[in-house]
Amino acid sequence: MTEAWRYSAQGISVALRVTPRGGRDDIDGLETLANGRTVVKVRVRAIAEGGEANRAVTELLAKALGVPKRAVRVLSGTTSRLKQVAVDGDPNELGEALRKLTAPKPD
């Protein structure tokens, strides 16, 4: 499976599939969509209304990756489950953190 993120000089750009009202705030690993694109599966408790789910996603990613909230922003997909999110910081450290967060969890 390919990575769901791309590296840049400023940080990384991450492809997400978000489930609002998902019962908990969590990163659920990687998923390959029907078109072959790999995304990070994210679920948040917030509803998809008034930008609440987008705020919850950026807060969850900031906390999980150890970056300030202002370092995470939605690039595209503000009204869609499929989003592209930019995270500013050291791209290698962010990529490694995402690899750990999306690794299959032992049963």
UniProtKB/Swiss-Prot annotation:
From the record, give the cysteines joined by S-S bonds.
none
Superkingdom of the source species: Bacteria
Q: Which family does it belong to?
A: Belongs to the UPF0235 family.
- Know the name of this protein? UPF0235 protein RPC_0058
